[in-house]
Amino acid sequence: MLLRARQSTEQCSRTVGKKIRLVFKFIIKRLGISALVMLTASVILFILTINAGDPLGDLRESTSPNRQNLIDRRIAVMHLNDPWYTRYFAWLGGTSKCFVGACDFGTNFRGQRVNDLLVDAMGSSLRLVFLSTVFAIVLGVFFGVMTAIRQYSGFDYVVTFISFAFFSLPSFVFAVLLKEYGAIKFNDWLEDPTISFATTVLFAAIFALFAQSLVGGSLRRRAYAGAGAFLFALVALVVISSTKWFLSPQLGWGFIIVVSIASAVLFASLFCGLSNRRALACTLGSSALSFLVFLAASGSLWQPTWGLLFVLLLAVILAGAVIGFVFGGYAKRSVVWANVWTACATFLAVFANYMAEYWADYTELVGDRPVATVGAGTPNFQGGEIFWLNVIDTVTHLLLPTISLTLISFASYTRYTRSSMLEVLGQDYIRTARSKGLPERTVITRHAFRNAMIPITTIVATDFANLIGGAVITESIFGWQGMGALFRSGLDAVDPMPVMAFFTVTGTAAIVMNMVADILYAYIDP
């Protein structure tokens, strides 16, 4: 008996060792092929860049008396008298130092270190694109799943139409429209933020139509949902208009309580179902604990640091996870996730509450035109010493470009998720799960959703790789100096160093994220 157990253990160890060797072999093979592709592409891009124009064109047209000295200096800085392959290998030698953590991407035509320019550009692009990518993934996957479940319904047709509209609309057109109506017109409206009764009824009706289509079910159920949503939106808009809420928005701890409880019920229903009373009690307990933690720290939250906010968020997440693990019962894993998302929702409500407290002060500092159209921050901002004013300034500058990038990417995620989900829902094992009497929520969330996410993994990995590349058109329209601006400036000046730095970072990110996607396939695929 012991001999058989030992043989079984040895066989298991050999199997695990073989799998590990195969994984390492796969990674090394992929890295070798990727390095060869990067090397070939870098040669082609370098040649194309240096032949894209005349790097001395602006100086040749200059009327400066020291024009020749400027030309000679640029020739020396850019090594224009050297053959292209000498310049290329000089760049390659500096870039190869990245393997020992000492990257040297050279200097641009002005003599500035490209390393410094690259760090600033990456930080700007990550701020601009990260949130939009996360929002696009979350919203796109959610609406993709919902449209697949409600195939050929009114909700499906509306979301499909909106998705194709955003996908077809050129990004520069959408960005310009956002600047005109989301910033300029909105800032003008803030001078007297009242909403006419006709507009109130129109927006309430649109919200009611959306709510009833999202609820689904029988006509009676959708009618009740639509009527309730209409009344809620109507009352909310009337109150907002009559109190001129946008001039000095107030949320308060009552708002935080409502959001916390609502998120607890929502995530409990999504992950466990409301029939699991134990899970619901755990999420409500996590909600209450999160609220008490933030209430206890409220004195420090008027002038916090990012470190304090991170510690508080981590604390409520860990507390929720412990509650779910200890008291979650047979569905403890699902309860843990429900508690984690509930804690995050409560944190966001607290964050929004403190931003609202400082909104009136911020609008006064920026001349009553809070929504920005250009740049990453207000020049010579007077409220820089106050944490929440800095946060509001960053958010108002991120708002429009984030919306622009989110809605364009949202269309792709919605369509891909819908088609993948429909394919999975037609599989035999889904019919088997339904025939066994499993609830539809369990069939969707535990059996169909995970498999439907396998093709989406590649798109998500590619999008995160594109984070570093930024969004050239969006950056240009909204005046952000990110990776796109770095690439464009190098190309305009026929300067290969910024262009090659852009290529190196984005190419490496693409290789790494595609490899991560391949590894995630093995984890997600059951």
Model-derived regions, located:
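Alpha-helical membrane-interface segments at transmembrane helix boundaries
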Residues: 24-32, 115-127, 159-166, 392, ...
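Hydrophobic alpha-helical transmembrane segments of membrane transport/permease proteins
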Residues: 38-86, 195, 358-389
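Short hydrophobic, aromatic-rich alpha-helical segments embedded in or entering the lipid bilayer
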Residues: 66-98, 478-489
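Alpha-helical transmembrane segments of integral membrane proteins
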Residues: 131, 138-145, 204-496, 505-523
